[in-house]
Amino acid sequence: MRKIIIIVLASFILNNCGYTPIYSSKEKNFYIEKISQKNTSKLNSKIANNLKIFSNENSQNIIEIEINSVKKIEITQKDDKGDPSRFQMTIVLNVNIINENYNKTQSFSSSFNYSNNSDKFALKQYEKEIENNLINKIVEKSVVYLSDL
């Protein structure tokens, strides 16, 4: 019963305070006409596909972007034997935005620290999951930036 009351109260508060989702269709005021990649990596392809999802074909703000991304995995901590115990994965996305009125370059990055795992297969699966999460964060940042242009 308490949960129902809290949910109803929260919905009234959020509706009355002017809350709007970040990615509502009216906020996407850009159309990506062309996405070119400096290198043809899987990382660039994933980012390009995610960016296309947020493109609004009805927008008057038509842009072309050139993307270049880099993924780094660094050892941040070692155990007593000298084996890595903690890593940091960082993804950096450089975007060159081209419009008839301007040419801007912006960089977005996101990183995550994680522990080593003795099961290398499980570690690789976890790294893929981390990579996808970091890509989503970077795409969110870039969509917000592109919406503000």
What annotation goes with each model-predicted range?
Residues 48-49, 53-54, 59, 66-107, ...:
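Surface-exposed short loop/turn segments
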Residues 145-149:
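Amphipathic, coiled-coil-like alpha-helical scaffolding segments used for oligomerization/assembly
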